[in-house]
Amino acid sequence: MKFLIVFVALFAVALAAPAAEEPTIVRSESDVGPESFKYDWETSDGQAAQAVGQLNDIGTENEAISVSGSYRFIADDGQTYQVNYIADKNGFQPQGAHLPVAPVA
């Protein structure tokens, strides 16, 4: 009987907890062309992302896309993190205050 009372009490507390508010989009822009793109968005909770991409060496065997941008998010610990990056023929190259930096060879 005690188990049932404790279970019902915990269930009631769980139902009474306030629901987390879903973030809404406060800004969203994009422009997509045949050889380039860009986008920029932000949500009400402070998350954001922006990027610009461009097709390089069009019409050659070295044709490749390069993208530069950044994104910002709030982690489970409540801290905001930002990552700036370049993604091109050399791979994804992120930078951020919270990311380790490779030693210079």
Swiss-Prot record:
Alphabetical GO biological process terms: chitin-based cuticle development; larval chitin-based cuticle development
Location of the Chitin-binding type R&R domain: 34-103
Membrane-spanning regions, if any?
A: none
- Signal sequence span is 1-18
Establish whether keyword Signal is in the entry.
Answer: yes
Answer whether the UniProt record assigns the keyword Signal to this protein. Answer: yes
For this protein, the record's InterPro entries field holds:
CHIT_BIND_RR_consensus, Cuticle_Struct_Prot, Insect_cuticle
Origin superkingdom: Eukaryota
The coiled-coil segments of this chain are none
Q: GO CC terms on record? A: chitin-based extracellular matrix; extracellular region
Disulfide bridges in this chain: none
The entry lists its GO molecular-function terms as: structural constituent of chitin-based larval cuticle
Q: For this UniProt record, give its keywords in alphabetical order, as a comma-separated list.
A: Cuticle, Signal
Write out the function statement from the record. Component of the cuticle of the larva.
Protein name per Swiss-Prot or TrEMBL:
Larval cuticle protein 65Ag1
Q: What species is this protein from?
A: Drosophila melanogaster (Fruit fly)
Per UniProt, what is the name of the gene that codes for the protein in this document? Lcp65Ag1
